Design a protein with these regions (language model features):
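S-adenosyl-L-methionine-dependent nucleic acid methyltransferase catalytic domains
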Residues: 1-139, 148, 183-364
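Core SAM-dependent methyltransferase catalytic element
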Residues: 82, 118, 147-166
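Surface-exposed flexible segments
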Residues: 103, 169-174
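Histidine/acidic-rich helix-loop-helix segments that form or flank divalent-metal centers
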Residues: 144
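Proline-centered turn/helix-capping motifs that create local helix->coil transitions or kinks
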Residues: 165-171, 187
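Active-site-adjacent helix-turn-beta-strand microarchitecture at beta-sheet edges
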Residues: 173-184
């Protein structure tokens, strides 16, 4: 039986004393975006200098002061990560008019600068395209030249590694890594540097104000990153947990997780995970398996037979690295204490995908 633990702290992540140095395999997070108006009050509560700079109309100083609030958290992220561990940070730039001056505030560049100062190695990032059909999406002078502005419809997923490349030396670690593989057809989409197929969050968080405060990113985004940059039973940290999306994705992926959230009002939202995570994870995993089967069927029509079979499911796969791939359903969740969830995961494949496949699928 695969078991995972998921701990949530409602504290400031600038001091993550409960997390040991070098104990985390992966960080997946999305901080409050500096210079986005909805976050002004939150940043100002932590530093009166920010409110003063806003009142004065000093955009550049406000930008730097807001990032100074985030800097200690990135320092903590670097501390708790293992050598070879990854940090994936979803961040959007901001556009804003202050004191009559419209400009871009490049949040991704400021975080990149801090990460490099800490000693992280920067890896190729992902552009997440968030298209909007809002009628007022065009900024500036509309159709007239020398006064209109490019529409900002993308965010960044910055990817960093601490130290040298991770190695899987022990036999059990190698086995877990093989079982944690992703499908070839997923790899071509997931490891692309532009994501066009991940839609914005549609989570039902109870009320509009809660959704705004959380700035939740979609489950699919966190799930992909966790499966791309960690193995089963690894520890995933989110220092800006919000509504618990990263925790939910870790639960669905057979990883352990730690989350920090400074807003106590979100505790009730995160607590609801125990009511929905088992059923929703099973559905998501089955949709993932079904997409692979559909890929197999379509490829057989155009390219012919496959060379390899998955050992657990029996369906064809493109590469030998997918032969031991296994998706573990969460089957039971308990909450032994406030802020702690424990999950038992199935170690056998989903029965409906372990049938006798037609000869045209399995004949090599």
């Amino acid at each position: 039986m695969l078991k995972t633990q998921h701990k949530v702290y409602f504290k400031d992540s600038a001091k993550m004393g409960a997390v040991k140095t070098g104990s985390v395999d992966l960080v997946v997070t999305s901080p409050p975006y500096p210079m986005i108006e909805m976050w002004d009050d939150m940043f100002s509560r932590q530093s009166p200098l920010i409110e003063a700079a806003l009142i004065k109309g000093d955009g550049s100083k406000t930008f730097e002061l807001m990032h100074a609030i985030l800097d200690p958290i990135w320092t903590e992220v670097y501390r708790v990560l293992k050598l070879g561990g990854f940090a994936c940070i979803n961040i959007g730039d901001a556009t804003r008019t202050i004191n009559g001056n419209f400009r871009l505030y490049p949040n991704h560049m400021r975080i990149l600068q801090k990460a490099l100062e800490l000693g992280f190695s920067a890896l190729p990032c992902i552009l997440w395209r968030k298209q909007t059909n809002a009628p007022n999406k065009f900024m500036g002078s509309g159709m007239l030249p020398a006064g209109a502005y490019v529409t900002l419809e993308h965010e960044y997923i910055l990817i960093f590694r601490k130290g040298p490349k991770r190695e899987f030396k022990k036999n059990n670690a190698k086995k877990i890594r093989r079982e944690s593989a992703i499908f070839w057809d997923e790899r071509n989409r997931w490891y692309s540097d532009v994501w066009l197929d991940v839609k914005g969050t549609s989570q039902a968080l109870g009320d509009k104000d809660t959704r705004l405060r959380s700035a939740a990113y979609p489950f699919e985004l966190a799930y992909r990153l966790i499966n791309m940059y960690s193995a089963k039973s690894d520890v995933v940290l989110d220092p800006f947990l919000g509504t618990g999306t990263t925790t939910a994705a870790a639960m669905a992926s057979g990883r352990n997780s730690i989350g920090y959230e400074i807003d106590p009002a979100l505790e009730i939202v995160i607590d609801r995970l125990k009511d929905v995570i088992v059923a929703s994870s099973k559905q998501f995993i089955r949709e993932r398996l079904a997409r692979h089967v559909e890929f197999v069927v379509q490829r057989l029509k155009t390219k012919g037979r496959f060379k390899y079979l998955n050992q657990h499911y029996g369906f064809p796969v493109m590469t030998a690295q997918e032969k031991e791939l296994l998706l573990n359903d969460p089957i039971k969740i308990t909450q032994p204490e406030t802020g702690l969830f424990e999950i038992k995961h199935a170690v056998k494949p989903q029965k409906e995908f372990c049938k006798n496949w037609p000869a045209e699928l399995t004949k090599i």
